[in-house]
């Protein structure tokens, strides 16, 4: 198969999330875990971006003037708060229903986000580039991880960053992030994640490195049931985040 014929889209996954689109902004609905996860990932994005671009973390709009792509944006749970930080955000998702929900919510909230029902490869082919590419909780739902990462990397400008968050392919992750989360705790609908589609860190790092990016940070993320919060951790066996940078 030629690269031109390759696709990152898993239509079954697109249909699955489209069917739940109306629940994106419900903090007690099917996307409750993402609402819980948002504070820790937003803080990580803000802190690492500010360090890279020489910004003040305490500023109300620390990402002012930066162009950001939120790929696989869903209903916009990440796009909106990043836009509130001052960034010019493009929220991209292959689901028309997700983009419709995201656009309606952003308009009602008065937050400017450029939402588009497009794929990563369509954006890359159009020559789009960004200071920051957010690839958060997406790679475990795409059809071709290597091609997806390579495509996203193409859009990172010199000196720019790519953030990736996903679930590791380990037995520990299978037990906690799939079996417990979907069958016991009922945090997620059954079938949200499939073990064979989970991604190990090296499977992300290899295509990023091949695309000229340097991996500058790795961190685990865990849920503390006592505080009811997600926190950064050195344990990357389940949830983790990676940060890549294209040299200036």
Curated annotation (Swiss-Prot):
The answer, when asked if Transferase is one of the entry's keywords, is: yes
Q: Which Gene3D superfamilies match?
A: Vaccinia Virus protein VP39
Coiled coil located at which positions?
A: none
User: Which keywords has UniProt assigned to this entry?
Assistant: Methyltransferase, S-adenosyl-L-methionine, Transferase, Ubiquinone biosynthesis
Matching entries from Pfam families are given as: Methyltransf_23
Q: Which reaction does it catalyse?
A: a 3-demethylubiquinol + S-adenosyl-L-methionine = a ubiquinol + S-adenosyl-L-homocysteine + H(+); a 3-(all-trans-polyprenyl)benzene-1,2-diol + S-adenosyl-L-methionine = a 2-methoxy-6-(all-trans-polyprenyl)phenol + S-adenosyl-L-homocysteine + H(+)
Any GO BP annotation: methylation
What is this protein for, i.e. what is its function?
A: O-methyltransferase that catalyzes the 2 O-methylation steps in the ubiquinone biosynthetic pathway.
Q: Which PANTHER family match?
A: METHYLTRANSFERASE, UBIQUINONE BIOSYNTHESIS O-METHYLTRANSFERASE, MITOCHONDRIAL
Q: Which NCBIfam families match?
A: UbiG (TIGR01983)
Q: What is this protein called?
A: Ubiquinone biosynthesis O-methyltransferase
Which organism was this protein described from?
Rhizobium etli (strain CIAT 652)
């Amino acid at each position: 198969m030629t690269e031109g014929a390759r696709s990152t889209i898993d239509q079954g996954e697109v249909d699955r999330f489209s069917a739940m689109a109306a629940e994106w902004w419900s903090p007690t609905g099917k996307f409750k875990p993402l609402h819980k996860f948002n504070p820790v990932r937003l803080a990580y994005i803000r802190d690492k971006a500010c360090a890279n671009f020489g910004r003040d973390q305490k500023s109300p709009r620390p990402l002012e003037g930066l162009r950001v792509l939120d790929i696989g944006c869903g209903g916009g749970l990440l796009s909106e708060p990043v836009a509130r930080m001052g960034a010019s955000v493009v929220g991209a998702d292959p689901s028309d229903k997700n983009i419709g929900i995201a656009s309606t919510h952003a308009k009602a909230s008065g937050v400017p986000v450029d939402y588009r029902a497009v794929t990563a490869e369509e954006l890359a082919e159009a020559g789009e580039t960004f200071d920051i590419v957010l690839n958060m909780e997406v790679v475990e739902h795409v059809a071709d991880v290597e091609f997806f990462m390579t495509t996203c990397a193409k859009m990172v400008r010199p000196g720019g960053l790519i953030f990736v968050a996903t679930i590791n392919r380990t037995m520990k992750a299978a037990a906690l992030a799939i079996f417990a989360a979907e069958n016991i705790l009922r945090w997620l609908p059954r079938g949200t994640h499939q073990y064979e589609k989970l991604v190990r860190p090296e499977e992300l790092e290899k295509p990023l490195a091949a695309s000229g990016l340097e991996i500058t940070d790795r961190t685990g993320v865990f849920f503390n049931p006592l505080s009811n919060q997600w926190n950064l951790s050195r344990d990357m066996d389940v949830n983790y985040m990676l940060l890549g940078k294209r040299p200036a």
